[in-house]
Amino acid sequence: MTRLLVECTHVFKHPTINSGIQRVVRNVIKQLPERVGDVECLPVISLRGQLYRVTRLAPLDAPLLNAVAAFGERLERLAHRFWQWHQRLDPRCPSKLTRRVLYVAYRLISFGLFGCPLRLIRLMNRKQLLKRCTPLQHQPGDQLVLLDSSWHSDFFPHAEQLKRDGVGIVAVIYDLIPLTHPQFYDTRLVQVFSAWFDWITRTADGYMAISATVRDQLRAELQRRVGPAHTDRLWFDYFHLGSELDLHSARATVEPRLQQLFSTPEPVLLMVSTIEPRKNHTYLLDAFERAWAAGCTARLCIAGRIGWKCDALLARVHNHPELNRRLFMFNELSDTSLEHAYAHASALVFPSFVEGFGLPLVEAMQRGLPAMGSDIAVFREIGGEFMAYFDLQDPQSLADLIIRFQQSGQFPAARNVADWRWIGWREASAQLTERTAHNVLKAPSAPARPYAHCP
C-alpha cells in the first residue's frame, strides 16, 4: 500500500519559528488528512539516518527545556548575524593576510560564543525530540514528500538510500528565486540552494509547487538543465497555500505601539514581510515619500523581522523624518498583533520583485483587507481583478494609487475584495496530498541517481 510520508524535520526541531516555509509546514502538518483514498498520510522527520513518525509537532509542556530551546534559537540568529557581519567585512580587507586573520578570528570567536553552547543545547533538545516521535520503518512504494526546507547535505545520503529501497521522492518547491535572482541573497545561501537543487533534479520523481507560476518556471528550468526527454518522464503539479494565522491567541495582548497606531482615524497601509532586498522596501519608501510630498496623510506600517542585506534600508527608516509620525516599523509582532494589524489597516501593499506565492496577500484578502501588489505573474494568479497593481519601474505608479485611494475612499481594483474567496489550510493540505497521490499512482518510477558527494 502506498503511503505519503510528509517530511517536516526543520519545523519539528524549531516549532516556534513562524515565518515563510515554517508557517506553511506547520499548518499543512496540523491539517494533514489521515488518508486520501487508499493512501495513508503520515508526518515524518529524518534524524541521524532514520525515519520517525511525528506524534506531536508542538514542543512538550516542559518550561525549562522549552526555555533552553528558545534561547538556542535566539543564539542561532545571533550566530547568523555574526556570520553576516563577517561577510560584510571580508570584501573590505586590503590583503589576503588581513582576510585570513579576520577569518581565523571569526572562527575562534564563533566557536567560543556560539559553537559550544549550541552543541550543548542540541544535546539537551535531542532527548525532548525523541519523546515527540516514534521510529518508522519505510516500505517499497512509500513516497517521501519533502515539504520542509531540506537544504542540508547530511540529509541527501539518507534520502538516496530510501530511494534505493523503493521509496519515491517528491519535492515541494516554494520558489526558484536563489537561482533566478541570486543578487537578493547571501552567497552561502545561494550555494546551498544551488547544491540542493542540483541534487533534487537528479533525485526527485515528481514535483509539487506552491503556485501554477512556480510549477511552470520549474518545468522550464528542468528542461534547460536535464533536457526535455528526462523532464517528460517526471510529473509536475501545484497546490495553493492557506491563510489562517494558527498562532493567534485570544489571551495574548496586542503590541501597545501597534494599538496606538490604529487608534487614530488616518488610513494605514500595511506591509508584512521579512526585511530583505527582494521585498523592495526601498521602492515602497520612495513611493510614500512622493505621496507625502503631494499632501497625502496616509501612514505606512512595516511589519516583519529583520533579514539580510538591509543595513542601508534600516538606517534610512531609523533616520527618517516621518518615523513614528507617518512611518512605523515593527520587527517582532506576534500572530495576535498581526491579526490586529490586518483587521484595522486600510490596505496591504506588497512591492516584492519576485515571489513563489505571496502569503501576506492571501492572509490580508481573506480577512477583507484589499491589497496593492507588484504587477508580477504570481500576484495576478492569486489576486486577479480583486487587487490593484503598480509598475515596479516607477514609484509614482504606487504613489498615484495611494493618493487616489485616500482621496476617493474607493479601492482602485476592478472588483471588490469582499467577493474574493480562497482556501484554508485544511483545503491546502488536502490539495497537496490528493494531487500528490493522484500523480504518484499514475506515474512510472524513476531509477535512483546517487548524490556526487555521498560516501
Where are these regions (language model features)?
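Carbohydrate transferase catalytic cores enriched for Leloir-type hexosyltransferases
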Residues: 1-455
